[in-house]
Amino acid sequence: MAEKSSKKLWGGRFSGATDPLMAEFNKSIYSGKEMCEEDVIGSMAYAKALCQKNVISEEELNSILKGLEQIQREWNSGQFVLEPSDEDVHTANERRLTEIIGDVAGKLHTGRSRNDQVTTDLRLWLCRKIKEVEVYVINLLKVFTNRAEMEIDVIMSGYTHLQRAQPVRWSHFLMSHALPLLGDLGRLRQLYTRVSQLPLGAGALAGNPFNVDREFLRKELGFEGIIMNSMNAVGDRDFVIEFMFWAGMVMLHISRFAEDLIIYSSSEFGFVTLSDAYSTGSSIMPQKKNPDSLELLRGKSGRVLGDMIGLMITVKGTPTTYNKDLQEDKEPLFDAFKTVSDSLQILTGVVSTLTINPTKIAESLTPDLLATDLAEYLVRKGLPFRQTHHISGSAVRMAEERNTTLDKLSVSDLQSLHPLFDEDVSKVFNYEESVEKRCSIGGTAKHCVQEQIEHIRSAIL
């Protein structure tokens, strides 16, 4: 049965009924109720601003505030009852407020549009959620730094192109993934200020005709600033897209780390073992222990990036100010927030319970990883690096042709490649000394890795 338009907040203009499917299609109540707390808080502040301008009396203000407090309690206790006619959380709250206090509830919307109301709610919600997810990033960084500090003496093969490259500390590898997350933390903190800008008082698009005190509203709601153009205030969703970009970057960083751990946990590598708490088995192969937590983290990164791209495409063709297309911002935002929040917490659990296998890690260290060190040995004796690179490469080929390892070549073998090789060349084939030579800022020497750990710790205080 078609729903009468006259019952709608906007129904006075219409004489015909709304098509039932259109009525459902138009709703955003189930996604929008995520912001029920913010909607009530915003309405309380706006009611006070109206009272300041004598649009409503003190008595009416008190009645509205008491009604809103009851609505707040009903939402918090799960007792708020949604009606089929509720189009969104704003209309649901106004309908319930009217039931509680009568027609005076209709004064609350004076000078206010759902356009500035919804973006106020959304900004308040996102400000709260940014503070929440910030804690999850910090907790993950703490786990990374604690683990790196404890296991700083473990040396492994580093990889480029997924081929063994040079020795590095395990902790250096961990810090290579922690530092991008530290960058994410910085971006999140910068983003907060851009989200924390007041749109309320912008009206539908042209501003508020009752001269409400927007500075009062800013302070009352805890915003850091005020959006200075009313058209921009109601039509802007950059803050949503920017958060979703942030979430996408976090998930990208999580995905790359997850991929490394998936590889390192395989039988072929065996560097790490996941806790049972973050693994699953096979329904047919009893021996299997699958890194499902890591695979899901990798998979969900695509989901969050898809949320961001989808909203950007939705917004890109919309005309200036508010359009109904913008109703489609909430579901991808809420999904991206939940996914990135859950993922950060899951990864924190994975890293904190991970077991490293030092024997397997040590087996990845082979003399060919020190070919660059062999070239640098000759550099220290005065030869140009391009020449020493070629000589070291010839030594690698010689070892391969003799089916032996680089460290097994005799001094005379090496001297046949260049006379500057001497007995002290044996010192090259020491993995600990190799990593300690990489001692400039950002290197894999022990004190450099400790500096990286302290850099992160000082940033998350």
Curated annotation (Swiss-Prot):
InterPro entries: Arg_succ_lyase_C, Argininosuccinate_lyase, Fumarase/histidase_N, Fumarate_lyase_CS, Fumarate_lyase_fam, Fumarate_lyase_N, L-Aspartase-like. One of its GO terms (molecular function) is argininosuccinate lyase activity. Keywords: Amino-acid biosynthesis, Arginine biosynthesis, Lyase. Pfam families: ASL_C2 (PF14698), Lyase_1 (PF00206). Belongs to the lyase 1 family. Argininosuccinate lyase subfamily. Homotetramer. This is Argininosuccinate lyase. It comes from Schizosaccharomyces pombe (strain 972 / ATCC 24843) (Fission yeast).
